[in-house]
């Protein structure tokens, strides 16, 4: 009996009710978890993450801010939780605009500080604009979002490859997917101006897939876009979230390939392989 009770408890922990989560629903554990993370960030969690990997400080703040954007999008405008989401996402974005967040990245890249820094931070900036009615959006925030979009578009237009560098001589396609998604977001919020750049990027990216799984590779040559590493589950998990924003049809087809080759539940628990099943 005790074994059965333990198994039941574990299944409940591993398999939350997915019906409570979705584009128009907010799981009851989301806000408490975010409040916990907000306290941790204010006590130096970002700095501790920086000790673990080069983008630790930046990534923890940007994902925290983006999670609050998702909360805000599920709340009635001007409700208490919507206003808290706006405040916390703004707080996170302000931290990304400081030297501590920019320190790992090179100003000499195109765009300055690289596609990872500009793409992710501008996606958060665009999320903040989404949370606010047009007449309430701070002009400085609008101007900065549009300026960063122009810088990204110019960098893509000048680049011999669809995958811009995040560091000198190093490029990860997922970062360019995020950056192109910000251009799509711009053309949703404002009069369209980046359609040609986005379409050119889609055509070039589709010519540079990892041929075996037919998916975007995790790492490429920054000068040619040549695949340096085969598709991996961690990278594809991020690609799946953003590619559908760029091209819904291609995004869904890439997601289907990803699920078929990388998603592998184990004993009822959701799981994602880092490599396809045939690779050990």
Question: Positions of the model-derived regions?
Answer:
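Structural helix-adjacent loops and short alpha-helical linkers that scaffold large soluble proteins
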Residues: 16-31, 71-90, 128-146, 187-199, ...
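Low-complexity, Ser/Thr/Pro/Gly-enriched N-terminal "stalk/linker" regions
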Residues: 3-63, 67-70, 87-101, 140, ...
């Amino acid at each position: 009996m005790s074994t059965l009770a333990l198994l039941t408890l574990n299944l409940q922990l591993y398999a939350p009710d997915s019906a409570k989560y979705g584009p128009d629903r907010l799981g009851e554990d989301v806000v408490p978890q975010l409040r916990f993370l907000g306290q941790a960030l204010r006590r130096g969690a970002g700095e501790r993450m920086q000790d673990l990997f080069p983008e630790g400080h930046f990534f923890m703040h940007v994902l925290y801010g983006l999670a609050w954007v998702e909360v805000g999008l599920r709340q009635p405008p001007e409700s208490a939780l919507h206003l808290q989401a706006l405040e916390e996402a703004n707080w996170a974005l302000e931290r990304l605009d400081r030297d501590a967040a920019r320190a790992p990245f090179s100003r000499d890249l195109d765009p300055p500080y690289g596609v990872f820094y500009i793409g992710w931070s501008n996606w958060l900036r665009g999320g903040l604009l989404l949370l606010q009615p047009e007449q309430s959006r701070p002009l400085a925030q609008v101007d900065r979002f549009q300026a960063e979009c122009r810088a990204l578009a110019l960098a893509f237009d000048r680049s011999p490859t669809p995958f811009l560098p995040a560091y000198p001589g190093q490029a990860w396609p997922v970062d360019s997917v995020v950056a192109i998604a910000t251009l799509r977001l711009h053309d949703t919020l404002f009069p369209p101006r980046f359609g040609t750049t986005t379409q050119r990027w889609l055509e070039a990216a589709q010519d540079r897939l990892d041929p075996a799984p037919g998916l975007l590779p995790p790492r490429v040559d920054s000068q040619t876009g040549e695949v340096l590493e085969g598709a991996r589950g961690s990278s594809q998990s991020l690609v799946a979230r953003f590619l559908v924003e760029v091209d819904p049809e291609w995004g869904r087809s890439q997601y289907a390939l990803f699920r078929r080759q990388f998603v592998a539940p184990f004993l009822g628990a959701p799981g994602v392989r880092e490599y396809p099943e045939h690779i050990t």
